[in-house]
Amino acid sequence: VFRRFLRICAFYGASPTFIFSSATVANPAEISEQLTGLRVTAVTKSGAPKGRKHVVMMNPDASPSRTAILLLKAALHRGLRTIVYAQSRKMTELIAVWAGSKAGAFANRISAYRAGFLPEERREIEAKLSSGELLAVISTSALELGIDVGDLDLCLLIGYPGTIVAMQQRGGRVGRGGQDSAMILIAGEDALDQYFMRNPEELMNRESEAAVVNPFNPYIMEKHLICAASEMPIKTNEPFMAHPAIRRAVSDAERKGLLFRSADGQTFYSNRKRPQREVDLRGTGVRFSIICSETGKHKGDVDGFRAFRETHPGAVYLHNGETYIVENLDLDTRIVRVRAAEVSYYTKVRASKDTEILEIFDEKPVHGTRVCLGRLKVTDQVNGYDIWHIHPSQKISSVELTLPPNIFETEGLWIDIPIEIQREIESQMYHFMGGIHAIEHAAIGIFPLLVMADRNDLGGISTPYHQQTGGAAVFIYDATPGGSGLSREAFHKAEKLLSHTLNVIDTCGCENGCPSCVYSPKCGAGNKPIDKTAATVILNGILKNRAVPFRAKPVLLENRQSQKDAENTEKYYGVLDVETRRSAEEVGGWHHADRMGISCAVLYDSREDRFFEFLQEDIYDLIKHLRRLEMVVGFNIKKFDYQVLGGCYDFDFSSLPTLDILEHVYQHLNYRLSLDSLAKATLETQKSGDGLLALRLWKQRRIREIIEYCTSDVRITRDLFLYGRKNGYLLFTNKAGNTVRLPVNFNQSPP
């Protein structure tokens, strides 16, 4: 958004000054420069008023949530205005419900607050908190920064929030009026919380982390490039086009039909007038509306990724202390239907994941292994969900689901596991898959110690054999489509990541693994299999070995496809067009094309470089000729010409390998173009007539003239095909009146 704004300002000769503010981030100038592309000067002296702040670290025997509720109850009775931070939306709602049930007279003075609430609901909660009508709020990071919530006294953190910056931001919500305040960190069972409980001085003495941003995230950048082009056409010689990532994103957007390149190749136009309406500044994906089926009221929103995990059919959905059951998840309309219900259980999804390496950015040896950084395609499949009783917490049953996979591209790193170590693990009868699974969990858990991140910002996959790496590997990737820069940062600290992971596992006092070391609350496989001992042996084997075993570089599957496409450039092809005896009106509509009859058909043969003519009685000879071809080319051939032919002869024309130029056009533009309009823009020629002319000629039995007309259409279709195959695009005049390029891939094998 900043760069779009600056681009327009530069066009009009304006040079605005930006003022950025941050209370906590360690690299304010750097992050501001990355956001704007401008040089920034940092002013780091703070003049904010401060009272005394007490910091308490608790490692409770009871669950962190239960401990927080007891502390909140005590705080309410003492009149302390309190904010409680939970780590997830669902936990925020659950704690608000549980706390309200135990708060007695204070029940109506407690509220949940999280993203997904409607804007008016959030504003109402903020106003009540500022006025004192609410004494306590249970929130996610939604109340972490950017909102003034009044003079609060006590901050309860249910679990370490992942970064020092986040902890300072949350703790900074209290004592803003200069009064004494307190922040209590209630440790959870996960690795990072327990690490700081064992090393409290490190938590207190750690500096704020440097913020990480990926200004070239292709998912986000693509949307803003389309907006930029609609605001002002993009020129290829603009300064920002010098960056390879931007050039690549523009090229991808052109290929998808989101940007149109001018005929001379120097300017890009947006495919829409107002693409800004479809851009969500708060997320990268689509959003689903949550509607109460009983009242029709809009209860909130959820992003596309969370929709599968939090609002699948049968899920328990919590909203502002109220419980709903999800009745339906409609992927076409992006609407989630829920109904109010009082239940004593909650739901947790079960999922599986797969990954494909698309590109390798970098690689390096780390002790006895190789660590790589690259672009990945992740397939996340929700398979079902488990139903858990709230009190006591125990699984009641499991339900299977049939949902489409969530597929996205992102950035990630992966650690090769040497085959020698795998053989050693298996010879000692340890569970190898359980070992690398444990490493994946522990590494993600300790990840925020090295990079400013939350474990929810990451995903992981461990596999005993990956087809592309040729062996076992542990993948850790950015959970944000396109990548957020976290894996890139961690790649440079790979040695520390491995050593810290080993330290967390080694120093945990449990015997077989626990949430403090190798269990993950996010695991879609229910933390099975897990082998803590195997993980220790694997990591020790890697860190004590300096010789990196040889393994071939991963095979990139897209390269195989490009080689295959290159082989298709010299296919034996024919170009076909058919003229009819009767019009659509005469046979009752276009859907009755099989009743139109054939006045003539013309086929161009690329091997013989000549045109062949066929009448209706020659249809069998035409089919024999078509079957010899490696590819049949036409314009609207699948929905029209083949239908006409099928009405005259019983043959499955869909079995022929066919390239339909109009089909390519529609897939790219989502609307149709005429053969004549493409010929005028691309070839600077035009059709010799139209279909109505051919029908008049048939009624007059002027067959030779029909054949000449049909041959002219075949010649135009052939020349469009050859132009597109050579140049990778056709030309057309868009709705704004600009002659622009339409990308095509006529070298790809037809289905």
Region locations from a protein language model:
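Acidic, Mg2+-coordinating catalytic module of metal-dependent nucleases/exonucleases
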Residues: L683-L742
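Extended Lys/Arg-rich polyanion-binding regions
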Residues: S181-M183, E189-R206, H224-P239, S251-D252, ...
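Helicase motor core with emphasis on the C-terminal RecA-like subdomain
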Residues: V1-I234, E238-P275, G283-G285, T295
